[in-house]
Amino acid sequence: DKTTSLDASHTENGYLMLCYNGKVSKVKLQITTPDGTVYTYTLNPDSYGSYETFPLSGSNGTYQADLYENVTDDKYALIFSQSLNVTLKDEFQPYLYPNQYVWFTKDSKAVKKGQALSDDSADDLDYVQQVYHYVIKNITYDKQKAETVASGYIPDPDATMESGTGICFDYASLMTALLRSQHIPTKLEVGYSGEAYHSWISVYLHEVGWVDNIIEFDGKDWSLMDPTLAASNSASSVKKYIGDGSNYTVKYSY
């Protein structure tokens, strides 16, 4: 297929790059992880002809990348398919790099802001708190946008900083970009707590390990785990945030 090229030269760093040169307005990429989880992305029409970046967040093994063009209504036709054998350099790789949902470059406003906040931080945990408070203080929840947002929405951290408003996904994307830009492995996780749709941010702190759900969105409000609990990473503190573990399901990690 001449319209599609896939760059698999960075799979050890936990991402692939795909370029679509066609003219169809709705194109979807499905990435199937080694455990069978299917991630569906909508390509950004503004990026046709250049590469977009997508995470490989399902650990080592064989991934499948399938590209579909919209034919009519909600029907899609497969135009490109490739399998990839992935061996990550380490478990942190997919959570350190930019991707379609957490985009930044060295010139991004988010990276410059991250550097400034980092310079004022005592350590990584302090920096996580600085990021949380910066975003909560400077971004206002956009209720109208939340009610009208279309599926396939792609957040843009710099645009969120410029507008000062955003929906849940915008907050999560900006926080994740700020954290990753300062080399803190960060998972943007989406899933369910009981019936409710949730977003979480989990970070890896060198002194502690992975701290799950250090920042959480419950569908209404953002909250930050008590830093002293985060530092000890005690099971009871995590339980307090997610309730009974059996009700808590991470569906996707970006």
Each predicted region: which residue ranges?
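Secondary-structure boundary elements
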Residues: 98-163, 211, 219-220, 225-231, ...
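N-terminal start-of-chain detector that recognizes signal peptides
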Residues: 2-3, 37, 158-159, 171-176
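Short N-terminal helix-initiation segments at or just after the protein's N-terminus
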Residues: 6-8, 144-149, 168-169
